[in-house]
Amino acid sequence: NHVNFTVRKGEILGVAGVEGNGQAELVSMITGMMPLDQGDVTIEDISIKEKTIRQIRTELLSYIPQDRLTYGVVSGTDIRNNLIPFLTERKEYRNGILMKTKALKKLADEVAKDYSVKCDSSEQYVGMLSGGNMQKVVAARELSDRTRKIPPLIVADQPSRGIDIGATTFIHRKLLELRDAGCGVLLISADLNEILELSDSVIVLYDGEISGYFPDTRKLTERELGQYMLGVKR
């Protein structure tokens, strides 16, 4: 509802809030999956209105979705095919109209190892993986400079939901590395610990509006943040 904020380069901006207060709609609009009725989303001064969803995902942002089974992976195919959608135009992986399968398998095996995906090989079906390893496949595709050109914005929507502490720690570390490399990171989470641990600054969504903004999280407490999330403070 008329929200306005900026994600700066080299910053993790956390979006806190009880679920159902506009987070899903916000993410859908930023990623181009929901059309904008009014206003705009610009990434490095480029309006997403001028881009297709594919162009947004290829050129402007990486996206780790909350629902990895619906939006993050194709569970009925192998790890390799889930890692390569951004590589289909690269000449080093093409032979005319055909893809170089051996080169892609080698890359996928190496990236899976880099991201500590526990699997037999990149030919294993994603649907056979644990939730944590499935999330690592999503992270490898979206966050590795070997599988894509890293865009200026990373959108991480509940990135640790339903995964073990090892996978959570791994993905958190990757987000921090990308922030330190100069990317802007938009972190949406209902987990107060995750928000406070990772975010440099925080906005709170309540009833579709920004109820609080904290430019520096170093002195922000769970209690204070929770009051804004519940609408006690605005």
Question: Where does each model-flagged region fall?
Answer:
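Glycine-rich phosphate-binding loops of nucleotide-dependent enzymes
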Residues: 1-234
